[in-house]
Amino acid sequence: MPKMKSHRGAAKRFKLTGSGLVKHYPSNKHHKNTHKKENRIRALKRNLVLSKSFQKNIREILPH
């Protein structure tokens, strides 16, 4: 059986924590920020944890 490979696009966007949760950075922060409120930009800096239904999908494509 061939070796399982990680989905490289997902590997760059999602990180698995030690407890098995999946973290990611939210979108809408990289450019065109001048019209956005400071509170919104500050909130977009934080890592977010995916919901359980999405975590299952991400774990399947990130076996390592």
Swiss-Prot record:
Name its GO BP terms in alphabetical order: translation
* Gene Ontology molecular function: structural constituent of ribosome
Q: Which GO terms describe its cellular component?
A: cytosolic large ribosomal subunit
Question: InterPro entries attached here?
Answer: Ribosomal_bL35 (IPR001706), Ribosomal_bL35-like (IPR021137), Ribosomal_bL35_CS (IPR018265), Ribosomal_bL35_sf (IPR037229)
- Establish whether keyword Ribosomal protein is in the entry: yes
Where are the compositionally biased (Basic residues) regions? Answer: 26-39
UniProt KW keywords: Ribonucleoprotein, Ribosomal protein
Listed Gene3D superfamilies? 4.10.410.60
A Pfam family annotated for this chain is Ribosomal_L35p
Q: Which family does it belong to?
A: Belongs to the bacterial ribosomal protein bL35 family.
Entry-linked HAMAP family: Ribosomal_bL35
Kindly provide the name given to this protein in its UniProt entry. Large ribosomal subunit protein bL35
